[in-house]
């Protein structure tokens, strides 16, 4: 897999299927696919285009997309298959996107023999791409990323926490216990939080996921 070619496909798809619709969606363009989970016509169009182009790049590969999975949960079995599989979240942060906010991302992973071989996150607003290849490293817009050192003081660390852990940190702060890290407001977009973690803007992330 040529990582740059995949990056180009992601960028071109965002330009054609996503960006023309930011702040341009009507109520009919947005629906609730499950309780609290939204999908827009941009999500569906982008996933369809990415799927087509990825399968053209690698004939015989399969696609597990967030929106196709919502319609057919049995597709999750593809994640455990031995063949090449593309996993796509066409718009991570759909709620933000549906409200015309700029905090959203496109996320793609490539699996083979049941293991993640590469992954891409693209910020269509900043036109920034971060990607990683198993055993080789990670890059953002061509610049190799390195792991930040562990020498920072705890009160210099900032990150994103879930409700439970955020409440516990708030109690520590209210009690005047020091030192403590800084909690930032949730982006409501994991992809953008992942990017800022990779770029060293955030030092920790914590989530609690429940498959629906």
Predicted stretch roles:
Residues 149-212:
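An extended, acidic
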Residues 66, 122, 208:
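Conserved residues at the C-terminal ends of beta-strands
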Residues 79-139:
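DPxDG-like acidic metal-binding loop motif
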Residues 18, 43, 54, 94, ...:
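Residue-level signal for inorganic ion chemistry
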Residues 117, 145-147:
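Short, isolated positions in well-ordered beta-strands
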Residues 65-67, 142, 188:
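Short loop/edge segments at beta-strand edges and connector loops
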Residues 1-91:
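N-terminal subdomain of lithium-sensitive/metallo-dependent phosphomonoesterases centered on the IMPase/IPPase/PAP
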